[in-house]
């Protein structure tokens, strides 16, 4: 499946430390498998848990990574 990144997601990846960055990239390559949950209130929005980070993405025939946030920020909504 094709994977695209929003500008916000690219910026977030650039700020993450290398050990976490490697884990995040590996998890994204394995999408849509992994610890994925559908976000309530959205038709095609999901989140992937990778350690202390949450990868937010949409799935509409392709996967678009919309944001990558630390757990606390992702849970605030």
Residue positions per predicted region:
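A short, surface-exposed loop/turn module that caps and links secondary-structure elements
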Residues: 22-48, 76-77
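Short N-terminal micro-motifs specific to bacterial/archaeal maturation
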Residues: 15, 30, 39, 65-66
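Enriched for short, Lys/Arg-rich terminal
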Residues: 2-4, 22, 50-53, 58-77
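Short, flexible helix/strand-to-coil boundary loops that buttress conserved ligand/catalytic motifs
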Residues: 17, 43, 67-69
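Alpha-helix C-terminal capping segments
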Residues: 13-16, 26-32, 57-59
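Arg/Lys-rich, positively charged N-terminal/basic patches that mediate binding to nucleic acids
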Residues: 1-20
């Amino acid at each position: 499946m094709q994977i695209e990144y929003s500008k916000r997601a690219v910026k977030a990846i650039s700020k993450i430390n290398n050990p976490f960055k490697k884990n995040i990239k590996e998890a994204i390559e394995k999408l849509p498998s992994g610890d994925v949950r559908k976000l309530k209130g959205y038709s095609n929005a999901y989140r992937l848990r990778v350690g202390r980070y949450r990868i937010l993405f949409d799935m509409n025939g392709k996967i678009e990574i919309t944001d990558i946030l630390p757990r606390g920020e992702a849970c605030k909504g």
